[in-house]
Structure formats: C-alpha cells, structure tokens
Amino acid sequence: MALKHYKPITNGRRNMTSLDFAEITKTTPEKSLLQPLPKRAGRNNQGKLTVRHHGGGHKRQYRVIDFKRNKDGIPAKVDSIQYDPNRSANIALLVYADGEKRYIIAPKGLQVGQTIENGEEADIKTGNALPLANIPVGTTIHNIELKPGRGGQIARSAGASAQVLGKEGKYVLVRLRSGEVRMILSTCRATVGQVGNLQHELVNVGKAGRSRWKGIRPTVRGSVMNPNDHPHGGGEGRAPIGRPSPMSPWGKPTLGKKTRRGKKSSDKLIVRGRKRK
C-alpha cells in the first residue's frame, strides 16, 4: 500500500499523507463477524477516568478476528482484504471449504484467491499457521502464541514480525522486533510471514481534527498545568520541572524508567533483553 500525498491547499493539508488503500478489495464488512463496540471514553464501570486522551471519534463496529487459527485440516480461500478501524493492520476474510467464514490479520503479500491452511501438516507459506516446532529456523513469523491455544499475542500490528532463531528441547528461540530473544513453547502456534500495511507508520496525520476522528483527545503538557494537577506544574512563566527526573501525573518516575514488574515467572524465558536506546 503506497502513501498518498496532498497539495497544500489548506494548512491542514500541508505535509499531510494517507494510505491509498490499493490493497483493499472490499469495503463492506462480513455482517456475521461484527460485534457492537460501545464507547468508553477512557472510563471504567464506575465512570471514573482510567485512561487519558480517549474520547469522541467515529462510530465503529468490532471485527471478530481469529487469532487462534485452530481450524485444522480444512483449507480456506482468501475472499477479500478489508480495512479494520480497530487496528493498524488490514484483515483478510477467509472462507473455509465447509462454508465457515473467519477474519485473520492480513500478512504482507497475501492475495485474493490464495489458499490458506492451519495445523501441523500446513506448508511453510505466507498466511499458513502451524506450531513453532514445525517452522524451520530463519522463518519470518507473526501472530505468535505465548501459551498453546490462547491465540496469538505477539507481532500483530502493521509491519510487525519475528524470526525463528533455533530450537532447544521443548522450546523455540524467537527474536522479536525489539531485539529481545525469547523462548516460547514449541506447541505454540504462529503464522508464517510479516504483517502487511508496512507504510502505516509513515502516515503524517497533518491536523488535530484527524486525531479526533480516531478518538484521540489532546495531550496537555504537565509543565503548563497547575501544581495541584501535575508534579511539573506551577512556577512563573516557562519554569523548569524542578525535579531530578520527569514524573507522571501521579508522581511516578517516567521517560526511561523501566515499568516491567520484577521477578515475573516468564523472566527465565527471556534469553536476551531488548535493545537499549
């Protein structure tokens, strides 16, 4: 999918880019795979704000995605590539030989009419899902499970991928995009290939209103708030934050502070940590 550039006929259009959606083959979603998606505006069930900068935006319906890829032995044909407003990647509608329809994340290079398979006997072909034990070393993969049968959790956004580095006993070594090398059970499933829509990260929003259409509200700097609203607030004019390191609105160290909880049971599965900036 290529980037579309606009003439600077208004200030909002200047430097603005968007995707040309050339890969999209169908605009109407499959009705049987839709669910209502009520707006929360960042509030929990008590009505309290728990996530900032959420609210407004266009009305959406949730597309039910098959992350488990557990329909083995029955081939499926790619019916269409569709846009999904709920994620950065595009989605592909599969029609199985028995008539069932399912959505999957569309990998790079997937074509309409292509046949897709799941299970241990599946070929090493883009879009096929099989256990890590059956995937050769060096293969690019995405939609990787962390626990067998739970469904893919890693490498699901646009352009994401990981690589199989080796096999040790019941574990498979996988290198993630962050540089982290992790051991994952060989019975966990993954999909062959890289997630499509690689140009997504290059899109220039261009104006604030376009973010509001997506349901993203403004992010106000702490330094322009009052001291009762943020640790960086207060002072006369453009005052410094007055602290040795930046703080979150709740007084916790941020911007570089590690947030992963210590002594997690999965720590022993991380062979090499992610790359430092």
From Swiss-Prot:
Belongs to the universal ribosomal protein uL2 family. The keyword Iron does not apply. Part of the 50S ribosomal subunit. Forms a bridge to the 30S subunit in the 70S ribosome. GO terms for biological process: cytoplasmic translation. One of the primary rRNA binding proteins. Required for association of the 30S and 50S subunits to form the 70S ribosome, for tRNA binding and peptide bond formation. It has been suggested to have peptidyltransferase activity; this is somewhat controversial. Makes several contacts with the 16S rRNA in the 70S ribosome. The keyword Ribosomal protein applies. GO terms for cellular component: large ribosomal subunit. One of its GO terms (molecular function) is structural constituent of ribosome. Residues 35-58, 213-277 are annotated as: Disordered. SUPFAM superfamilies: Nucleic acid-binding proteins, Translation proteins SH3-like domain. It holds the Pfam family Ribosomal_L2. Keywords: Ribonucleoprotein, Ribosomal protein, RNA-binding, rRNA-binding. This is Large ribosomal subunit protein uL2.
